């Protein structure tokens, strides 16, 4: 079984539509904020958290600002609050021997995310690089 969380009702409706189109049976979606989630632990937690810092919003291309809700792009702070929450709560969110995969940006907050991982994570971790050789995903296990 798999679950999906999003605080956006529109995102949940879109996910449900895609689930049906793909014929997926064992997937449930919940309209819930990850900061308030305290249900069952996951074997695999996969997330592309909002990572833009508040000051980066103005430099976004207009097409991005028109298409995506700002809450999907930024935490309206430094861009790291989701990472800090997810990484520091790894053992509450992920089962023993489970895995957390987080997309990370190539931006000013990348080093902050790496520091958060070093400060809050007692588990193993590694980074996957993109085609340009830049860290793009952190795996915590």
Regions found by a protein language model. Give the residues of each.
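Conserved Class I SAM-dependent methyltransferase catalytic core
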Residues: 77-140
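Residue-level signal for inorganic ion chemistry
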Residues: 15, 48, 64, 86, ...
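Residue-level marker of structural boundaries
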Residues: 20, 66-69, 109
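Conserved SAM/SAH cofactor-binding pocket of Class I
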Residues: 1-57
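Mobile active-site "lid"/loop adjacent to the S-adenosyl-L-methionine
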Residues: 51-81
